[in-house]
Amino acid sequence: EILSQADNPRAFDALIKAIEATNSGLLRYQYARYLLGKQQLAEAKEQFDALVADPAATVDHLIGAAVLDIELSDSASALLHLDRALSLGQRVSDAQFFKALALIQLGDPSGAIDILGEVGPSTNYARALQEAAAILISEGDIGAATAFFEKHRKTHPNGAELNFAVHAETLQTLGSIAAESVLSSGISAFPTSTRLLFSRANFRERAGFFELAEADYREVLNLNPGDANALNALGYALTNNTNRFAEAAGLLEEAISKDPRNPAIIDSLGWVYFKLGKDRQAEVLLKEAYKQYPDPEVAAHLIELLWTQGREVEARDLIANQWRASPNNEHLRETASRLAIPLPE
């Protein structure tokens, strides 16, 4: 009730008095988290310091205090709290992850890698894998990063599906074609993983192997018939890679019937309607998508519609606004180049 009145400066008077009167760890912890959310870090630290001063501090209190210390670059203090948390045997993977972050902050990447190797499936599992890969890649050792992922899959088999996904994402950021092999291995191990199938479909589509990508998109639909996101992915891919626009429109119309407020689906349907020559319907949809989600890719679709209708001033204004917000964006650059639209200086 008090938190619901947070905009009232006097709303917390009763809470603070209750904390002072009872020294309730639960109330103090809730107040500390509220202060964190408001970015009142110094005030939040006062509350966390009081919490961890109690010998009976809970794991949540200790990890919360450590996370704040890391935010404040007080890594040594964070490590003390995290070691206490680890001794309690609860939320072990979370404590290990944040301990690794503290070690990174202290300039001990080797120690961080050792700890990250112990983090099991948990809230921060994907971030742990990403941090480890970033350390190893920054040292110029892609092979060591791959070995880390492979070892982790063996020691933490319950996290293997997510491991394959993060491993492939890491390789893709490096422009490595080995990402497809990792995804294929993952799909062999987890043939019903829509996450891995989506990732491989996206990779194959970008690499120019659309027939293979389409097969993956369709397998996702086989696993999740009628799923709006899967329908959108396949419909949008067909629009961009084939002239099967009527088929794509059918998929996207089904998608929007299931999720009518999704701006990605609205954009996709507007885009395929444009390809079908339904300019009036396309414009309504593309403008609505852009209103909800002013993304450069959505903007590029609307820019192309406007430009091909001879509405060059509107198109130039839109591309200028987007170019300022997202300079050198690939979608804007490709559209401008293909249509010979001058880009802003």
Positions of PLM-derived features:
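Alpha-solenoid helical repeat scaffolds
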Residues: 1-345
